[in-house]
A protein has these predicted regions:
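Exported/extracytosolic protein signature
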Residues: 14, 23-310
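N-terminal amphipathic/basic-hydrophobic helices that include classical n-h-c signal peptides
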Residues: 1-27
Length: 310
């Protein structure tokens, strides 16, 4: 993405916007100027002079992956190209880390990961520039050599202010400024990954259980992801009961299950396995805290209960 950057220098030959000369792409910015002449209470306007300023700096910003998930790390690459004969130094990169309005202020869904800055000029790694973690993230002391390029790479952590629902996005904006240039703005958008995020916990009751008594295992499956687990996902739960249980009673989300269609149990080894396609878990729902702006996750939950005689 290119923005207008105004710069003038000697011996500029006329070129068209976007024209390639000696392997370099040049872009034009046009300006106009008009003078006035006042005399004897009269005012005369001059003709309008039209000039063009040759752009020599361009920039682009990309994410290594265009999707994110909860607590993910995103790697950003900012590339600055100098198509002119003069080195630019003292440039500053300011990244808003995806800040967006909330209430009367803003919240920021990304946090800079300390120590991850990499700074290259013409492909050669340079000493790390000065970094202020922010938000916003500020990287200063950038130099772009004449006819060359600079690349800044850094990582950001997805935090509690990042929306996670389906079709959510983080729009990230960075501005390159300083060194006498007109600021250049670059943007990158990443999308919330569509996926389930499952955890499972197991509890037992009663504790202790009497010999030849009934023992119950409860499996709580939680989904903090924005996508439900459906039959075609073929989720399976496997367990080996020790001590081995007999006379099993199994239910899933309060509905009794039958051995064969829903599960398989080997009473000689204690191995229990659900049949693929029977375990389903709804997607999570999300709500934003009205005070802090942090996103609260309400997991989707399914429960498998297995009881048997010890």
């Amino acid at each position: 993405m290119h923005k207008n950057t105004f710069l003038s220098y000697d011996r500029v030959r006329p070129v068209k916007a976007g024209q390639i000369i000696e392997g370099k792409v040049f872009f034009m910015a046009q300006f106009t100027n008009q003078a006035t002449l006042s005399y004897n209470n009269a005012v005369i306007n001059s003709n309008i002079a039209v000039g063009e300023i040759l752009e020599v700096l361009s920039a682009a910003k990309t994410a290594v992956r265009d999707e994110y998930s909860q607590n993910d790390t995103v790697t950003y690459v900012v590339s600055i190209v100098n198509a002119g004969p003069t080195t630019f130094s003292g440039l500053t990169l300011t990244d808003d880390l995806g800040a967006y309005p909330f209430g009367t202020g803003t919240v920021t869904p990304l946090s800079y990961v300390s120590g991850t800055i990499l700074y290259y000029t013409n492909g050669v790694l340079q000493p790390a520039p000065a970094v202020t973690a922010g938000p916003p993230l500020v990287v200063s002391g950038i130099t772009v050599p004449a006819g060359g390029n600079a690349t800044i790479i850094y990582e950001a952590q997805v935090n509690q202010f990042a929306p996670a629902a389906l079709d959510s996005t983080i729009i990230n904006t960075a501005v390159i400024s300083g060194g006498g240039i007109t600021p250049i703005t670059v943007n990158e958008t990443i999308n919330a990954l569509s996926e389930p995020l499952l955890t499972i916990t197991k509890s037992v009751s009663p504790v202790p259980v009497t010999e030849n008594g009934r023992l119950t295992y409860t499996f709580l499956i939680q989904n903090t992801g924005n996508t439900a687990v459906v039959a075609t996902d073929n989720a399976v739960i496997t367990d080996i009961f020790d001590p081995i249980l007999s006379d099993l009673a199994v239910s899933f989300n309060g509905t009794a299950w039958t051995e064969g269609p829903n599960y398989v149990y080997d009473e000689t080894t204690g191995t229990f396995t659900t049949v693929a396609g029977n375990i389903t878990v709804p997607a999570a729902t999300y709500q934003q805290d009205p005070t802090t702006g942090a996103w609260i996750v309400n997991p989707g939950v399914s429960t498998l209960v297995i009881s048997g005689t010890v």
